[in-house]
Design a protein with these regions (language model features):
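The beta1-alpha1 cofactor-binding region of Rossmann-like NAD(H)/NADP(H)-dependent oxidoreductases
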Residues: 30, 51-62
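Hydrophobic positions on the long internal alpha-helix
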Residues: 78, 113-117, 121, 159-160, ...
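Catalytic loop of short-chain dehydrogenase/reductase
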Residues: 83-103, 111, 122-169
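Conserved glycine-rich Rossmann-like NAD(P)H-binding loop of the short-chain dehydrogenase/reductase
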Residues: 19-35
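C-terminal helical subdomain
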Residues: 169, 176-179, 184-224
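Canonical Rossmann dinucleotide-binding motif of NAD(H)/NADP(H)-dependent dehydrogenases/reductases
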Residues: 1-24
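A glycine-rich helix->loop->beta "capping" turn
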Residues: 45-46, 66-79, 85-87, 173, ...
């Protein structure tokens, strides 16, 4: 789980541990990751924290080596880490440096992690890749705001489709999910964390032979 120390990522870690999964909680700040893991799993039986910066190839490679050395396997990858909800910007006035930073984290970040973990995923009997996207990445519903975030998430959706087609022969199911905005000061009246996490859990737990290459919310297709 990338970006697992807070918000929806943290809740997904909690729910996966309750379902019996062994969870690697990736966090840019290892101390915060270790604190989250301790709070979610005081006995340390199900959740282990790992330092991970998805925009840093060295960090991603170190994470993959650590996972292989400690667990020897990866069955599920949830790409949750993201950045730059630039609701103040429009496509006509966006700072392209900011756009590049968002793409590096929100698109290239998951891509790096997939490359690093793919050998272990290919060896799994039940491999899954879940890319946490957003309605902001839905081309069908885009308007004029948040260009960095929207374009990077639309790219993540495209990557989901490409990988689903390529990796079908390996039995790897690749899906994108839109968890919806959780309730917060920035988004009052949003979904509970449990509701938002449910879409991710669904994509993790679908059986072999299930759907791949989809973009869903609450297990229902969402407009591309």
């Amino acid at each position: 789980m990338t970006g697992g120390n807070r918000g929806v990522g943290r809740e997904v870690c909690r729910q996966l541990a309750l379902l019996g999964f062994g969870v690697v909680l990736g966090s840019r700040d290892l101390r915060k990751g270790e604190l989250a893991a301790k709070e979610l799993d005081p006995e340390g039986n199900r959740i282990a924290a790992c330092q991970l910066e998805v925009d840093n190839s060295v960090s991603v490679a170190a994470m993959a080596d650590w996972v292989k050395g400690r667990f020897g396997r990866t069955d599920v990858l949830v790409n949750n880490a993201s950045t730059m909800y630039d609701r103040w910007a429009t496509a006509s006035n966006a700072d392209l440096g900011t756009v590049a930073e968002a793409i590096d984290v929100n698109l290239f970040g998951p891509w790096r992690v997939i490359h690093a973990l793919l050998p272990m995923l290919r060896s799994s009997s039940r491999p899954r890749i879940v890319n946490v996207s957003s309605e902001g990445g839905s081309i069908a519903t885009m308007t004029g705001g948040s260009p960095s975030y929207g374009i990077s998430k639309a790219g993540l959706n495209a990557l989901t489709r490409l990988l689903a087609g390529e990796l079908a022969r390996d039995g790897i199911l690749v899906n994108a999910v839109c968890p919806g905005w959780p309730d917060s000061e920035a988004h009052p009246g949003g979904r509970s964390l449990a509701q938002a996490a449910a879409s991710v859990i669904w994509a993790v737990t679908i059986p072999n032979g299930g759907p791949s290459g989809t973009f869903t919310r609450d297990a229902q297709l969402f407009p591309w």
